[in-house]
Every structure is written in C-alpha cells, then in structure tokens.
C-alpha cells in the first residue's frame, strides 16, 4: 500500500509539474545545417554539443515536448529553418539568422519575396555585432523598411559573443557593437517596427532598460543569460530585478539560445523558476504572456 501510494504521489507530482509549467514560448532557438557540426564544441561547463544536425533537432524537439514549449522562434539558415518547420509548423516560428545583409546570397528583393511567400515570420537573429556593423547602417535599411511595411518582427543580437570568436570566425566582432544604444536611431526612424533585443543587452543591461524606458514598443528576451555561464546568470538576476522595479517586466520574454546544447533549454527554465524575487505571475508573463502579446498570437 505504501509503495502504491508513493507511485501515485510521484505521478501526481509529475502531472502537477506539467500543469504548473504549461505553455512556454521560447523566443530564441537556433537550427543548423550539418556543416555546423564539423568541429566539435564544448560549453563553459565542458559539456559537448549535439553530434550532428539530426541529433540536435531531435534533442531540441524532445525538450520542447518535455517542457511544454508550444511556440519557438527558430533562427538559422533558410534551409535549416525549413527543415525544422516541416517537422512541426504549428510550433515553429520561422526566423532567419543574418550577420551580414548578404548572407546566403540574401538581398532585400529575395527577402521581400520570402515574406510574401510566408517563409519568414521574424527577421532575426540579426547578429550585426559579429560583422562589425549596426542595425542603423545603410545596408540594413531596405530590410527594416520591408519589416515595417509587412509587420515582421525584428530580433537583434546585443551583448558580446563567444570567447575568442574575434580570432576565428568573426574577425570584425567588437564588444562596442553589442551596446543596445546603437539601436536608438532604428527605434526613432521606424516607430511602427516591432522589435526585440536579444540577451537584454548582456553587459549593457542598464542601457537596455533605459531604451525600454524611452521607447515603449521595445521588448527583450533574456536568452543565454539563464544558463550559459555564471556571469551571464548574474546579468539575468540584476536585469530582472531592475526591470521589475521599473515596471518593465511586461516586455521581458523567455528565450534559451540553446545553440549546440539543447540541455540549456531545461537549465534556463529551472533557473528562471528558482528566482524567488519573481512572483508566479511574473514568471508566467515571462514564459508566455509577454511573448504572446508581442507576437499577437490569437487567444
């Protein structure tokens, strides 16, 4: 009888956990092509990344199911995003990852056609930091005009990048290009643009908060801050406390930025849930409600 009761209790706790953590929107997920896995990678904690593109997709979708992630903005090459969308088009919100305006042979004409063909739902992640540019540079303006015209949300990287990246794959990356203040001209020139910054400015989270104060249309995700390393988790705590104090939590959205490590999804969720200064309502808003409002999802 005791054993049976324990089994029932375990089942109840699992069910309660699933109910209490229902419906998450992840505003920052990455898809990759096979070539991205040619060089093995380990994270800050020494954990190896997924072995290949198929394993990475499966591990990420398994996490979606486990943690009730009902929608996810998937950013990657058009080819990889199409692969993910074909697996679960109801869950996947199609993004496109660009560090330079001409990545994948892209130009504004091709991009506008993709928008018309409903092959892109979010313009991002836009990694201007990695190419040593800013979203206010002239080369990006045709894309922004299209996004404003068709009401396509824009997601732009802020903060730094991977340690040593400037010495290898992103030689033009400089920390100064991660400052959210570099987006101010975009916010001024495109007042109707739906835009969210990624990583809440990271090192410059105070700048992110100040922009959110001046420009009430600006949202942010807190992706990568919740799991990748202790310094980023400190940024997450400080940013969220300040955003709560200022009354801006209603524009803060959950994101993972799992990169090659899908385990970061669960770790991010658990870390956010562990923050005792956030109420249950705060967490529900960050996990789902704020993103649903930003994305204008139908109820």
Residues covered by each model-derived region:
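Active-site environment of divalent metal-dependent phosphoester hydrolases
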Residues: 32-34, 79-82, 101, 130-131, ...
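Histidine-centered catalytic micro-motifs
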Residues: 24-34, 155-159, 197
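Catalytic pocket-lining loop regions of alpha/beta-barrel enzymes
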Residues: 121-122, 136-253
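Active-site neighborhood of phospho(di)ester-bond hydrolases with catalytic His/Asp-centered motifs
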Residues: 25-27, 74-75, 95, 124, ...
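Mid-to-C-terminal alpha-helical segments outside catalytic/metal-binding sites
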Residues: 2-4, 21-30, 36, 43-67, ...
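Active-site gating/metal-coordination segments in enzymes
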Residues: 79-165, 172-174
């Amino acid at each position: 009888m005791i054993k049976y009761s324990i089994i029932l209790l375990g089942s109840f706790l699992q069910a309660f956990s699933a109910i209490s953590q229902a419906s998450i929107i992840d505003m920052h997920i990455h898809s990759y092509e096979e070539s991205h896995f040619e060089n093995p990678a380990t994270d800050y904690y020494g954990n190896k990344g997924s072995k290949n593109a198929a394993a990475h997709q499966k591990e990420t979708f398994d996490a979606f199911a486990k943690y009730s992630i009902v929608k996810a903005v998937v950013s990657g090459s058009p080819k990889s995003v199409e692969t993910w969308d074909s697996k679960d088009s109801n869950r996947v919100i199609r993004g496109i990852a660009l560090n330079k305006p001409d990545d994948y042979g892209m130009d504004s004409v091709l991009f506008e056609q993709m928008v018309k063909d409903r092959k892109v739902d979010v313009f991002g992640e836009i990694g201007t930091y990695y190419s040593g540019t800013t979203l206010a540079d002239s080369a990006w303006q045709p894309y922004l005009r299209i996004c404003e015209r068709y009401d396509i949300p824009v997601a732009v990287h802020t903060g730094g990048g991977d340690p040593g990246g400037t010495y290898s794959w992103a030689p033009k990356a400089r920390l100064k290009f991660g400052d959210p203040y570099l987006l101010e001209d975009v916010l001024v020139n495109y007042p109707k643009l739906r835009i969210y910054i990624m990583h809440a400015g990271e090192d410059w989270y105070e700048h992110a908060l100040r922009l959110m104060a001046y420009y009430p249309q600006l949202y942010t995700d807190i992706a990568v801050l919740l799991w990748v390393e202790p310094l980023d988790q400190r940024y997450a705590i400080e940013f969220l406390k300040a955003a709560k104090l200022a009354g801006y939590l209603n524009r803060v959205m959950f994101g993972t930025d799992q990169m090659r490590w899908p385990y970061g999804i669960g770790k991010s969720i658990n870390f956010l849930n562990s923050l005792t200064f956030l109420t249950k309502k705060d967490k529900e808003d960050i996990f789902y409600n704020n993103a649903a409002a930003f994305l204008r999802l139908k109820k």
